[in-house]
C-alpha cells in the first residue's frame, strides 16, 4: 500500500524555468532603463553564462554582471534589476495546472507528501510559501539538508 508521495519542486510542481526566464527578462529591461548600456540579448547572454558557471540559484548574478562590465557594482542599476526580478518572479510563481487539486486529493486519501529538491533551503521554502504549499508537505528535503544533488 502506498503511504507517501514525494515530488520534486522545480519543473514538477511549478514551471521554474519559465518563472526564472520572466524574472531575468524583467531585470534586464529594468537595468537597461536604469543605465546599463547593453542590448537585452547581450545582457541576457552574459547572465545565462554566469548561471552556467555558478549555478541557476546563484544569488549574486546581477552583481557579477555589473562588476564584469564596470569593475564595480552600480547600485542604481543593481537595485532596479533586483526589484524588477522579484516582482516578475512573484507574478510568474504559479503551480502547473491541476497540481493543487492533485495534492489535495492525495492528502484527502491519507497520503503523506514530501518534496526533494536541488534548490537551497531558503529558495525552496520561499517558493513553497509563495505557492501556498508550505502547510501541505510533511517533509521537505533540500540541497542544504543533504549537500548532494539529485541524480
Go through each PLM region and give its residues.
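Substrate-recognition "cap/lid" segment bordering the active-site pocket of phosphatases
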Residues: 92-94, 114, 120-151
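A short, charged/proline- and glycine-enriched loop
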Residues: 1-2, 110
